[in-house]
Regions:
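Short, basic (Lys/Arg/His-rich) helix/loop patches that form interaction surfaces
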Residues: 308, 318, 398-441
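Acidic, low-complexity interaction regions
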Residues: 196, 333, 388, 392-411, ...
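Flexible interdomain linker/hinge and immediately adjacent N-terminus
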Residues: 146-169, 265-299, 343-350, 382-391
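Active-site/catalytic core of tyrosine-dependent DNA strand-transfer enzymes
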Residues: 358-416
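Conserved tyrosine-mediated DNA breakage-rejoining catalytic core shared by Y-recombinases
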Residues: 318, 327-365, 453, 499
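Charge-rich, intrinsically disordered N-terminal extensions
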Residues: 1-272, 300-303, 313-314
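Basic, Lys/Arg- and aromatic-enriched nucleic-acid-binding interface segment
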Residues: 292-322, 426
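Active-site-proximal segment of tyrosine recombinases
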Residues: 324-326, 430, 437-449
């Protein structure tokens, strides 16, 4: 039947030039019952209206596998997906896939090349179908184990370059601790940025897992005492994490437990920590790209997608934080007394202006025109192509740059593959400012540092500064060497003449 075929071409968002109509379709006649056809029709129509062409191609492969599964002997009496609970369906699907020689795990490669494993696409697709068809959860959002931030009745303080949509409490294994944590997170969301709250939730998951293994009788935060905390802090300090991560974890755990203590009147929690529990922060090594490294990176960056290449080059030329670059507005360019200026909205603080070169102004103007031609009027210059009302996402850029580095095997001066640290471009910019012999106040102003003492890091990394500061010592060492060579005979005289 014609209406049992759902064509991609019937949906404007799935139009793909050069694709034959018959190649882009879902065939509902593959399903054994009318009830199953209607159930899958609802989900497929939803996906076709909201998904991308590439995602739907992947969906179709998974759908075809599931259609074969539903026609197998084990399902011969099944009329509807509602005839079994979701976990039973998933268990049976996994068994069928193994029988058919279809892998039930998917290898996932991170942007850094590390490999992890998760459920195969077919299983994830079936989970989504079952969830879509399941009963609507009518509980208040804060009663659920996964919160949709858009459904909370508070304004979320977030950085628009990061796509945070949910908070997941499912891996806090003790039900009472999970509920206590929800109350604390809800309170902290009203005063803290979402990134800070995410850190608190992360350490609570780690703490919960530790309690489950080592103190399985503990069911509530009211039962946590100093001995339990000390044992956990020892466990945390012996894990393969950095000192700075441990320090942040302890601070986040303290904040979360003290909030729980205040809400539930668990007085013990408010006095559980002592100052020495927080490990001293180890200052991270201040690194900067060499000129050769910058040349190698930029040679490949300029071959990437034109708007991403512009974004990264503008980021380097401005010396801003990546969040400031990605949230630049189309009206950011101005001229004052013949000088091109740019207005920058800082996510963390305020907005400010700084002078820029004519070349940078032209590059910005090209970026603005590109976005206007492709997406019309937008709030940001660099936009998320799927959601143009939002800025380009940090992880999207990171993934594309790291993929390029892996593909090109692009290495630094030490023979190691480049990482992706947008702050390194900022360091390079700062070092170049010091080599122009600008004063600390001007450098701090151009980099929008609040304190002048931050400038010392850039000065220490400057090759010019190192050359100036070590010239006298190097000359003294040379004199000593020459004095020694002078005693060894005429054959070494040539060394001094060549110097």
């Amino acid at each position: 039947m014609e209406n049992d075929i759902i064509y991609f071409s019937d949906f404007p968002n799935l139009q793909e030039t050069g694709t034959r109509k018959d190649n882009g379709k879902f065939d509902l006649t593959l399903l054994p019952t009318q009830e199953l056809k209607e159930e899958f029709r609802g989900y497929i129509m939803y996906r076709c209206k909201n998904g991308t062409f590439r995602a739907l191609i992947q969906d179709r492969t998974a759908y075809n596998h599931i259609a074969k599964f539903l026609n197998s002997r084990i399902n011969r009496r099944i009329k509807s997906l509602g005839d079994r609970n979701p976990e039973k369906w998933i268990s049976l699907l996994k068994g069928w896939m193994l029988e058919q020689g279809i892998t039930i795990v998917k290898e996932k490669k991170s942007v850094y090349g590390t490999v992890s494993y998760g459920e195969a696409v077919t299983i994830l697709y079936f989970r989504n179908v079952l969830k879509f068809l399941g009963p609507e959860d009518l509980r208040d959002e804060i009663e659920k184990d996964v919160w949709e931030l858009k459904n909370l009745d508070i304004k979320i303080r977030s950085n628009p370059i990061y796509n945070v949509k949910t908070l997941d409490f499912r891996k806090i294994y003790q039900p009472d601790i999970r509920e206590e944590c929800k109350k604390a997170v809800y309170m902290n969301l009203q005063y803290e940025a979402i990134g800070t709250v995410q850190g608190e939730l992360t350490i609570m998951r780690i703490f919960s897992e530790y309690l489950q293994k080592e103190y399985s009788k503990i069911k509530s935060c009211s039962e946590i005492d100093r001995e339990v905390l000390e044992e956990f802090l020892i466990h945390l300090s012996t894990k393969d994490t950095s000192h700075s991560a441990n320090s942040s974890y302890v601070i986040s755990l303290r904040r979360q437990l003290e909030t729980i203590g205040k809400i539930y009147s668990y007085e013990r929690l408010e006095h559980l920590f002592i100052n020495t529990d927080i490990p001293p922060e180890v200052n991270a090594e201040f690194r900067v790209y060499s000129d050769d490294e910058m040349k190698r990176l930029n040679a490949e960056i300029t071959q990437m997608d034109v708007q991403i290449a512009r974004c990264l080059l503008i980021h380097q030329m401005l010396g801003t934080r990546i969040s400031d670059t990605l949230t630049l507005r189309p009206d950011c360019l101005t001229r004052e007394n013949g000088q091109d200026m740019i207005e920058i909205y800082q996510v963390k603080t305020k907005r400010y202006k700084k002078p820029i070169s004519k070349e940078l102004a032209k590059l910005l103007q090209s970026s603005i025109e590109y976005t206007q031609e492709k997406f019309g009027d937008t709030e940001y210059i660099f936009v998320n192509e799927k959601e143009p009302d939002r800025p380009m996402q940090y992880m999207a850029i990171k993934t594309k740059v790291m993929s390029m580095i892996q593909e090109k095997q692009l290495k630094d001066d030490h023979g190691e593959l480049f990482g992706f640290g947008t702050h390194m471009f900022r360091h390079y910019y700062g070092v170049k400012l010091t080599e122009m012999h600008l004063d600390d106040w001007t450098i701090a102003r151009l980099l929008e540092h609040k304190r002048l003492n931050n400038v010392q890091h850039y000065r220490k990394m400057s090759n010019q500064r190192m050359a100036d500061e070590t010239r006298e010592v190097r000359q003294r060492m040379s004199d000593i060497i020459y004095m020694s060579l002078a005693r060894w005979g005429e054959e070494y005289e040539q060394i001094r003449q060549d110097d």
